[in-house]
């Protein structure tokens, strides 16, 4: 499973929130964290028979194990089909652009970004030194690949970036183009995204979790994402 080796505060926060939800059996959604805090203060029921806890689990110093009720095991941020799997993916995948506690867009995997005067061209600079859990570097190619998958004709997940109006996205989705013309890799750490019109939510839509092209793109062919649906995590 791929995780980005980056100690961002936002990811640590997501982990804490996800753990709280997981400890509650997935009953509480992230939007109900305040309610989760109340329940946690009331106490957590300990294991009925602590002797059944494996010795290896007792000795862990760097791993937290939390149970969830009904996971489907699809730990992919763009293909999960229930909230339990979403809770897990929110912990192990970091966003390109995130939100702070006031709902303001803030850097995530992206170090910074600029927007053209006409609000149609977004130049995103990645943080240097980021790697996936296998040690491979996070690059602009990975971001471009992720956005391309979301514009694939066969993509039917919950993430809809068509409203970002990326240039060439509609043609790629319709099978009229071999690539998305609005996605341009400037250098390993810089991606330029050109849109056909300004949009207030464009940055949020293109700033989601990033998939490793080397891992998730091994069998990619436009119009066939079946392999990605079965490649969990």
Cite the ranges covered by each PLM segment.
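Extracytoplasmic
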Residues: 59-63, 91, 108-110, 117-121, ...
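Gly/Pro-rich hinge or "lid" segments in bacterial periplasmic/extracellular proteins
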Residues: 197-233
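N-terminal secretory signal peptides that target proteins for export/translocation
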Residues: 1-14
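N-terminal lobe/hinge region of extracytoplasmic solute-binding protein
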Residues: 46-52, 65-117, 230-233
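Bacterial N-terminal signal peptides
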Residues: 18-30
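Sec/Tat signal peptide C-region and signal peptidase I cleavage site
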Residues: 30-36
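Aromatic- and charge-enriched surface segment that lines or borders ligand/interaction sites
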Residues: 111-159, 192
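N-terminal low-complexity, Pro/Thr/Ser-rich intrinsically disordered segments
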Residues: 39-63
């Amino acid at each position: 499973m791929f995780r980005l080796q980056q100690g961002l505060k936002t990811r640590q926060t997501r982990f804490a929130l996800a753990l709280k939800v997981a400890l509650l059996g997935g009953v509480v959604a992230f939007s109900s964290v305040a309610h989760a805090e109340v329940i946690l203060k009331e106490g957590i029921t300990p294991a009925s028979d602590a002797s059944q806890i494996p010795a290896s689990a007792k000795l862990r110093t760097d791993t937290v194990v939390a149970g969830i009720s009904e996971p489907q095991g699809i730990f992919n941020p763009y293909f999960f089909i229930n909230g339990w799997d979403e809770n897990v993916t929110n912990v192990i995948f970091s966003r390109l652009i995130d939100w702070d506690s006031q709902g303001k867009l803030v850097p995530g995997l992206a170090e910074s970004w600029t927007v053209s005067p006409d609000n149609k061209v977004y130049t995103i600079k990645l943080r240097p030194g980021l790697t996936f859990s296998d040690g491979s570097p996070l690059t602009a190619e990975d971001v471009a690949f992720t956005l391309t998958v979301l514009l694939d004709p066969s993509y039917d997940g919950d993430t809809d970036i068509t409203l970002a109006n990326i240039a060439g996205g509609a043609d790629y989705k319709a099978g009229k183009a071999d690539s998305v013309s609005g996605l341009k890799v400037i250098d390993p750490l810089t991606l330029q995204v050109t849109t056909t019109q300004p949009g207030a939510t464009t940055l949020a839509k293109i700033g989601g979790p990033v998939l490793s092209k080397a891992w998730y793109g091994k069998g990619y062919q436009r119009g066939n994402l079946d392999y990605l649906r079965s490649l969990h995590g």
